[in-house]
């Protein structure tokens, strides 16, 4: 199923691989898998995650291909302790920060939930029709998560 979803916006094999890895991480997080289990799956099927953020931070730069941003975004999640910490990790490495933050944030939200105040504020930036779409998707596909306090 993740291939069908990713092919809508990604038509290069590496792009599909990166989007699929992200979708699988979100799925596994929503299934209650641990970070270690999710990381092992990514390492086995998608990317070697044999680095830390501290190791790459001094030299990491903007890297457009998925293999230069998806593993880094996922590592930002794996090294986090909360939703907000995950986003801070993602931004801290530099590079394509909006992409890395979006990838990391998707997995972090599935794993931790988003704090209510962050979610509420973020929704104010969306047009109402997109808020309605989000609510319909969540009703069909997502268990409600309380989010962090």
Q: Where would I find each of the regions flagged by the language model?
A:
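Compositionally biased, intrinsically disordered low-complexity regions
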Residues: 49-52, 115, 149
């Amino acid at each position: 199923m993740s291939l069908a979803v990713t092919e809508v916006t990604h038509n290069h094999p590496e792009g599909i691989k990166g989007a699929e890895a992200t979708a699988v991480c979100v799925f596994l997080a929503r299934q209650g898998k641990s970070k270690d289990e999710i990381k092992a799956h990514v390492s086995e099927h998608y990317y070697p995650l044999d680095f830390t953020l501290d190791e790459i931070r001094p030299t990491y730069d903007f890297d457009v291909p998925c293999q230069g941003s998806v593993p880094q975004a996922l590592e930002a999640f794996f090294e986090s302790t909360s939703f907000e910490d995950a986003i801070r990790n993602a931004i801290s490495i530099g590079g394509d920060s909006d992409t890395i933050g979006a990838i990391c944030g998707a997995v972090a939200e599935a794993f931790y939930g988003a704090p209510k105040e962050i979610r509420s504020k973020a929704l104010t930036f969306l047009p109402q029709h997109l808020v309605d779409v989000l609510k319909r998707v969540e009703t069909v596909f997502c268990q409600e998560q309380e989010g962090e306090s």
